[in-house]
């Protein structure tokens, strides 16, 4: 295997130490992913340089121009304290003609807006739950095309941020309360969609022109409290 120079971008507070020795599982939880990526790449024989990035693009340019990495491994999930700005870092890498891992800017933009992503999926005739968007400041009123129960999510936040057992509502009063929570506490528009109980499956896909589908894995819910619904929560 060819030895590569790999520049790993990450949040400054998540730059891992050289060793996990002396750290408890709780202490290392925040930067475990970054540590695993760096150590695995090094064990594979590559030269790895972690770089903490938060508010400045100049450090990226310096490393790309001076160190000339073969690839930039992008672990950033935000830039300038804004999740939706991560796409701009990738755009900058493209301007530098640097090869990088992960989605391109277009993919990040499309996946960030859940409503836009759902419309694209619907265009390709893939079935999905019905939904409605309540913008900040707009009072929620469920359209006739939807019926309870529904689940209330953030429109643009990723992962399960803002999702809890309280996200599933079955009447107008609870709907208004949860939408207000998303608007005021999470400062995001609210995505409200039909709640469909089922299994939680994750499918990873890598590649560009030729796509490879990785093995499916399932999130199994155990020891749920009485009345709890099996959903992934933050």
Which residue stretches match the model-derived regions?
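Structural detector of well-ordered beta-strand residues that form the stable sheet scaffold
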Residues: 72, 101, 129, 151, ...
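Glycine-rich phosphate-binding loop of ATP-grasp-fold ATP-dependent ligases
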Residues: 130, 150-178, 200
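Short, hinge-like loop/turn segments at secondary-structure boundaries
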Residues: 66-69, 90-91, 117-122, 146-150, ...
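Short, glycine-/small-residue-rich phosphate/pyrophosphate-handling segment
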Residues: 112-132
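ATP-binding N-terminal substructure of ATP-dependent carboxylate-amine bond-forming enzymes
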Residues: 1-101, 105-106, 111-112, 123, ...
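Phosphate-binding site of ATP-dependent enzymes
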Residues: 172-234
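Short, surface-exposed recognition loops or helix-turn segments adjacent to catalytic cores
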Residues: 131-136, 193-197
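ATP-grasp fold ATP-binding core
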Residues: 121-122, 146-164, 187-197
């Amino acid at each position: 295997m060819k030895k590569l120079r790999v520049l790993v971008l990450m949040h400054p507070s998540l730059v891992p130490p050289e060793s996990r020795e002396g750290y408890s599982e709780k202490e290392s939880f925040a930067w475990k992913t970054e540590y695993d990526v760096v150590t695995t790449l090094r064990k594979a024989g590559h030269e790895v340089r972690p770089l903490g990035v938060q508010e400045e693009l100049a450090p990226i340019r310096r490393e790309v121009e001076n160190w000339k990495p073969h690839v930039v491994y992008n672990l950033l999930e935000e830039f300038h304290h804004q999740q939706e700005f991560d796409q701009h870092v990738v755009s900058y890498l493209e301007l530098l003609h640097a090869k990088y891992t992960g989605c391109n800017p277009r993919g990040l933009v499309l996946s960030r807006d859940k409503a836009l992503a759902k419309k694209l999926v619907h265009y390709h005739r893939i079935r999905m739950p019905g939904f409605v968007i309540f913008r900040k400041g707009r009072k929620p009123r469920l359209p006739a095309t939807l019926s309870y129960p529904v689940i209330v999510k953030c429109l643009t936040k990723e992962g399960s941020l803002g999702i809890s057992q309280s996200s599933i509502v079955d009447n107008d009063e609870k709907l208004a309360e949860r939408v207000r929570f998303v608007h005021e506490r999470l400062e995001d528009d609210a995505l409200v969609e039909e709640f469909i109980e089922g299994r939680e499956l994750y499918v990873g896909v890598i590649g560009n022109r030729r796509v490879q589908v990785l093995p499916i894995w399932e999130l199994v819910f155990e020891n749920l409290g009485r009345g709890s619904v099996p959903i992934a929560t933050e």
